Amino acid sequence: MKPQFITLDGIDGAGKSTNLAVIKAWFERRGLPVLFTREPGGTPVGEALREILLNPETKAGLRAETLMMFAARMQHIEEVILPALSDGIHVVSDRFTDATFAYQGGGRGMPSEDIEILEHWVQGGLKPDLTLLLDVPLEVSMARIGQTREKDRFEQEQADFFMRVRGVYLDRAAACPERYAVIDSNRNLDEVRNSIEKVLDGHFGC
C-alpha cells in the first residue's frame, strides 16, 4: 500500500485532541512510519497564520480568512505533506480542507464554488485517502466548548454557526462515503477508540 494521507476532522468539541492519541497508539503498535501534523499550522508560516486566525482580536474578513487558511495549507502541502508521502511516510493531519468547507463555507457563508477553486489551485489532485469525521450532537459540542477556559476566535461563535458547520461536514461525508468514516464520538472513550481502530484496521487491511 502506498503511503496514506489521513485526516481527522469534526466540529469543535467532537474530541479530536483525545482521539489523536488513539490514532498515534494504533500506528505505534504496528510499527508503521507516520507523521502527525495539523491545520492551520504544521510549518513556521502555517503556525504564524494560525496565531492570527485563532486570535479573538483578529478582525479579518471572510475572503481574507479563507485565503489565509489556504496560504497555510499550500505551505503545509509543499513543506510537510508531499515530502513525507514521497519518503514513504503516512501522514495524519488534524484538520484539512473539509474544515474550510465546513467553517468558512457553512459557518461563515463562503460560496463552495469559490472554495473549490482555491482547493484545486492549492492542492492540485491531492485529497485525503481517508477522513475520520468525529461527530457529536450540537448540544454536546456547545457544552464541551463551554468548558474551555480560553476560547479561540471560532470557539466564540454561537450555536447556529456550529449547526451549519456540522451540517456541511455530514453532507460531505454522505456524498463521498468511500473516503469518510463518520465516528459517533458521543460515547464513552473505549467505544470511540474501538470504532476508530476498526476503521483503521479495515483501511490498512489489518
Curated annotation (Swiss-Prot):
Q: What protein name applies here?
A: Thymidylate kinase
Task: Tell me which Pfam families the record gives.
Answer: Thymidylate_kin (PF02223)
The catalytic activity, as recorded, is: dTMP + ATP = dTDP + ADP
The role this protein plays is:
Phosphorylation of dTMP to form dTDP in both de novo and salvage pathways of dTTP synthesis.
One GO cellular-component annotation of the UniProt record comes to:
cytosol
Q: Which NCBIfam families match?
A: DTMP_kinase
Gene Ontology biological process? dTDP biosynthetic process; dTTP biosynthetic process; dUDP biosynthetic process
Q: Which UniProt keywords apply?
A: ATP-binding, Kinase, Nucleotide biosynthesis, Nucleotide-binding, Transferase
Query: Which residues make up the binding site for ATP?
Result: 10-17
| Family per record | Belongs to the thymidylate kinase family.
